[in-house]
Amino acid sequence: YKSSAELAPLIAEAVGMETKDVQKKLDTKLPSGKDAGAATLIRRIEKQQADNLKKLIEEKKLSGIIVSPDTKRYYPNGSFLSHVLGSTNSDGKGLTGVELQYDSALSGVPGRKITELESQSGGFPYTISQFTNPVDGKDVTLTIDENIQFFAESVASQALIDHKAKAVSVLVMDPKTGEILAMVNKPDFDPNNPYDGIENFVGETDGEKLQKMWRNRLVNDTFEPGSIFKVITAITAMEEGLVSENDTFTCNGSLTYGNRRIKCWKSGGHGTQTFGEIIQNSCNVGFMQLGEKIGSETLVEYIKKFGFGQISGVDLPGEAKGIIKKAANMSITDLVTIAFGQTNTVNSVQYMAAFNT
């Protein structure tokens, strides 16, 4: 074949690439503008692609094309646990998840041999070569329970369909040890092909779509916890001796602070309730009154004690700390809304760890 234009379509068909991409590789130039002596066309191809290319080389008697063995991380369960495990690039470097967090431990150290050579006969006689033995990468053992993870993945996938949701996340934690037993985000991706599937995600650029696909929302995203935070407020009041089971709270449907009227979820109000009943009814007004009793300094103190506003130490990359308003900057409106779960933000792992404390 006289030109890359003639050869490119044949190679492209064999390995499943675009002809223009193959030709660009064949026409690779050095910085000086001269033709490059060699270029890597594609890495980590499947066996069938390699066989196709070898057959083409043999049939067309092509020279200068080398199909060489390479290493590739293989994930036998596909997308299972993908946001936790993460994935690697073509050089085996971690991109996301545990692969990124523990890249240096998993990679090991390659061996080396240093020796003197000459062009005709190879090594010089009587010279001493220096050897450095390779060091295997270490194993990383996860707390994930495979059976619980499988069930959680199935539930999340079904919820995505049943509720026509944009995304579903599931987190399961052992309340006694804090160990994470399952962590699921749907939709997910296949770490064997970590760049495939970005068309299912929204973004202005492919890079933005890719980051959304890889994003472990349970660790990387924060949210206003809402009513689930009322447990933290209730425990704070109990620990400080500011409330008893016989204390009563009156809810008429809203309370006004300054110019802002803040409503309970039940527009007609819950009437007079005990401490236990404001928890049972998830009454916003009752928890606003409880927040006033606690005060900003004490509430922030307990928020920090429960681990909010700081990383949980989950050992996954990019954990978001969340935003916790300082007591000195807190208005009365901030105080009462924080008491029932608004204003501050947390991540899912933080909340689960706090709830299980």
Which positions does each model-derived feature cover?
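Soluble periplasmic/extracytoplasmic beta-strand elements of cell-envelope proteins
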Residues: 40-44, 66-68, 83-87, 141-143, ...
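Carboxylate/His-rich catalytic cores and anion/metal-binding grooves
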Residues: 92-121, 167-192, 299
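Conserved, well-ordered alpha-helix/loop/beta-strand core segments that scaffold catalytic motifs
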Residues: 38, 125-168
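Solvent-exposed, polar/charged alpha-helical surfaces in well-ordered, non-transmembrane soluble domains
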Residues: 2-13, 20, 24, 43, ...
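Short secondary-structure junction motifs
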Residues: 36, 62, 165-168, 244-246, ...
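Small/polar-residue-rich segments within soluble enzyme cores
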Residues: 2-13, 24-137
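Acidic/histidine-enriched alpha-helical segments
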Residues: 21-32, 72, 165-177, 250-252, ...
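Beta-lactam-recognizing serine transpeptidase/beta-lactamase-like catalytic domain environment
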Residues: 118-128, 144, 176-227, 232-357
